[in-house]
Regions:
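Sec-dependent N-terminal signal peptides
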Residues: 8-18
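Sec/Tat signal peptide C-region and signal peptidase I cleavage site
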Residues: 20-24
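Short loop/turn motifs that connect adjacent beta-strands in outer-membrane beta-barrel proteins
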Residues: 25-32, 71-78, 132-139, 200-205, ...
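Short glycine/proline- and aromatic-enriched beta-strand/turn motifs that initiate or cap beta-hairpins
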Residues: 25-67, 243-245, 255
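Extracellular/periplasm-exposed beta-strand and loop segments of Gram-negative cell-envelope proteins
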Residues: 45-57, 89-121, 151-187, 218-235
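Transmembrane beta-barrel architecture of outer-membrane proteins
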Residues: 57-63, 79, 118-124, 139-141, ...
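Predominantly the C-terminal beta-signal and adjacent terminal strand-loop region
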Residues: 89, 187, 192-255
């Protein structure tokens, strides 16, 4: 239901942008295009069912951003934003005893550590609303929309042999994920976030944003014959972006 609602919101804004010249008497017409690049950090995990104890997996993201601003309706600046990002996501297991103490491997003498790194090409499309200055100064914004991801590759980091794990001291005995490769190469979900933008007419736009993504698909099969009933990605992104204007609305009253 949430996915349908987000799609309706995005379609409504896209239709609004395409019809903006015909509705200039309702809102203040804009036709502005900006292009740029950004990057940041990604904190991610996988929602396994049965549950796998985890801490946040740390990764990086970088990519291109395209923004089309179509209208200012009362105080809200309406835009559509599309991105293409290279993102490092995954999960990092929290291998503990019942006393919440890290499990020590009896062979290596080291605390057992397991991490799966997965690389995706992520493509979100956002409906964006902003409030504040457009040409010079600060603007707060909120954006939400669908996101798809294309799986590129994966890598495992572990400091013990799975057959020689210290199973006796582990709280969780779920290890199926440790030997399974990604089965579903296409990911999809809903992303949304908020941030602050600073604009200068001769320099461009600088954006700082926090974003959350919730995957609606699974990386593994989820039928009755499969081990996991759910295995969806979720992540938090902290991102900096720079945009420069390709096209501006010819209106000296825009501040």
């Amino acid at each position: 239901m949430a996915g349908k609602g987000m799609r309706k919101l995005l379609v409504a804004l896209l239709l609004g942008c395409s019809a903006a010249p015909l509705m200039a008497q309702v809102g203040q017409y804009r036709s502005e295009l900006a292009l740029g690049a950004g990057g940041g950090v990604v904190l991610s995990n996988v929602g396994f069912m049965p549950k796998v104890p985890q801490t946040m997996h740390n990764g990086m993201t970088a990519g291109l951003t395209l923004r089309y601003t179509c209208e200012k309706y009362f105080s809200s600046i309406c835009a559509v934003v599309a991105e293409m990002n290279y993102a490092q996501v995954g999960w990092k297991e929290d291998i503990l005893t019942p006393e919440d103490v890290p499990v020590v491997n009896k062979v290596t003498g080291l605390t057992e550590q397991y991490q799966r790194d997965m690389t995706y090409l992520q493509i979100p499309v956002f409906a964006r609303l902003g409030w504040g200055r457009e040409r010079r100064g600060f603007q707060a914004f909120f954006q939400v929309g669908p996101q798809v991801g294309i799986f590129l590759n994966e890598k495992t980091k572990m400091n013990f042999d799975l057959a020689q794990r210290n199973a006796a001291q582990r709280t969780s005995q779920i290890i199926a994920q440790d030997t399974m490769g990604v089965e579903h190469k296409f990911d999809y979900g809903i992303a949304g976030g908020a941030g602050l933008e600073f604009s200068h007419p001769k320099v461009g736009h600088f954006l700082l944003e926090g974003r959350y993504y919730y995957g609606l698909g699974d990386i593994y099969g989820n039928s009755k014959k499969d081990f996991f009933g759910r295995s969806n990605l979720s992540n938090i992104v902290i991102k900096l972006t720079y945009l420069f204007d390709l096209k501006k609305t010819n209106n000296s009253k825009i501040k």
